C-alpha cells in the first residue's frame, strides 16, 4: 500500500516526509529513497531531516556516483531527482542503479515529493492530439513495481488536475483486484465520465480508508 499526502503549500510536507523516513529508520530500515523535483532541494531535505535529529550526511544525492558505478552507501537516504530517475547512458540507467542498491527485499520508504511530476505517465489526449506517457512518470512507476515491499509515500499539493494524472499512484489500490475497476484504463474512463463529482468520491473514499490526507493552512489571523 501507499499513502498520499496532499497537504497544501506551506503545510510542511517536506518535514512530514523526513518524519516518515525517520520512523522507518528507527525501526531498522536504514535505506530509503527520496525523489524530489530538482537538485537544489537537497538542502531543503537536509534541513528537514536534521531538524528531526538526523545527520546532514545521512542524505546523499545520487549525483555523487557515476551512472555506471555501484552506489557505495551502506545506510542512508538516497536523494534522486525526477530528471535523474529517467536518465540513461548506453546500457546503464539510473533506475537500475537505484534498484541494485536497494536490493530486491527493500522495505524502506520511497517518498515521491512533488509527485505530480510523474503525472503524464499514462499519456492520453493532449491539446495537439494523443501523446505518449512521460519517461519520468514511467520510471517512477517502474521503481514502485521493482521494489514491491517498499513503503510508498506520495506528496503533492496538486495531486491530480486531471484523473489521468493519478495513473502513477499504483499503490493506492484505486484499480485492480478487490476494486470496482479491472484496470487503470477502466478507472480513468469511468471517473472521467463522472466529472468533478466522481473525483470528489475518489478523494472521499481514499480519506475514509486512511490513504489520503489534505490539510491547508488557516487564513485566520
Tell what function each PLM region has.
Residues 1-5, 30, 148-151:
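Pre-Walker A (Motif I) flank of P-loop NTPase domains
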Residues 18, 42, 163-167:
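An amphipathic alpha-helix signature
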Residues 4, 14-15, 25-139, 179, ...:
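SF2 helicase/translocase NTPase motor core
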Residues 2-20:
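Walker A/P-loop
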Residues 19-26, 47, 145, 168:
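Short, well-ordered alpha-helices that flank and scaffold nucleotide-derived cofactor binding pockets
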Residues 109, 129-220:
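Conserved P-loop NTPase motor "coupling/switch" region that bridges the ATPase
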Residues 8-9, 114-116, 157:
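Conserved Walker B
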